[in-house]
UniProtKB/Swiss-Prot annotation:
A cellular-component GO term for this protein: membrane
Taxonomic path: Eukaryota, Metazoa, Chordata, Craniata, Vertebrata
Record's protein name: Transmembrane protein 248
PANTHER family: TRANSMEMBRANE PROTEIN 248, TRANSMEMBRANE PROTEIN 248-LIKE
Polar residues composition-biased segments: 82-103
Pfam families assigned: TMEM219 (PF14940)
Gene name per UniProt: tmem248
Protein's cellular compartments: Membrane
Organism from which the protein derives: Xenopus tropicalis
Amino acid sequence: MILILHPLENLKSYISSRPPLVIFMVSVSGMAIAFLTLGYFFKMKEIKSPEMTEDWNTFLLRFNNLDLCVSENETLKHFLNETTPPESTVTSGQARSSTQTPQALEDSGPINISVAITLTLDPLKPFGGYSRNITHLSSTIFGHQIGLSGRDSHEEMNITFTLPAAWNSDDCIVHGHCEQVVFTTCMTVTAASSVFPVTVQPPHCIPETYSNASLWYKIFTTARDSGTKYAQDYNPFWCYKGAVGKVYHALNPKLTVIVPEDDRSLINLHLMDTSYFLFVMVITMFCYAVIRGRPSKLRQSNSEFSPEKVALSDA
């Protein structure tokens, strides 16, 4: 007995007689392609770890929401350019020692961490600048002002910006008004250790040797979060006769915690195996459709009502 196959006819019959199975095959094919693409994506792309919600990139980006006001009414504080002995400061390296437990970190008190960050000072029109050389800007904020939640939202944080060069009114006199200036500053944050992320830290700067000015003057600024602009008690003259400072942190890919390569390879393997299984299922169903075509009951019923049999019965 010779088996004669009509693949195209069988496939057409299968599609017309079994639409639900055809839709199922298309859906499974789409899932297989999606898993295959996703597996390739996990293999080739570095993925941010979902387990680590806060790293130093996200932490420093929080300061972008701050507005600092450098007012003419603030009192300047003069201090000497003296290097602080290493023994008198709790460094970030000590605070992040792997031998310390979380409880020990909480009991160690406030720590200082200094990182380089961009500070923009945008003087308003009435602002006339300072005759003294301003080398430091200092402010005190609370955790909720930079979007921290829970217990950290009530933590007090002292921020000090060390300017690489003195900021004074010399340029204001030359131009007739004070223009916007941009500094790459050394920002020192003093706060409880629980406020800081426990991930890889950015490169540190040394405030004591950052500025090249011989005389140091510090000015205290007030800070507010950007959400205050939309509050009902917003004061449009909040920084009248002052300069508005904005902090800007550029993303550093080295600070982002990524999924380890071994984990990504394992994810890729599972996704590939799943996609291969789905492809085999689709190919099997396709071969069945090519060989069998429409159901046998449907073929039998059609043969019973074929034109030849109808003609013979009429005769």
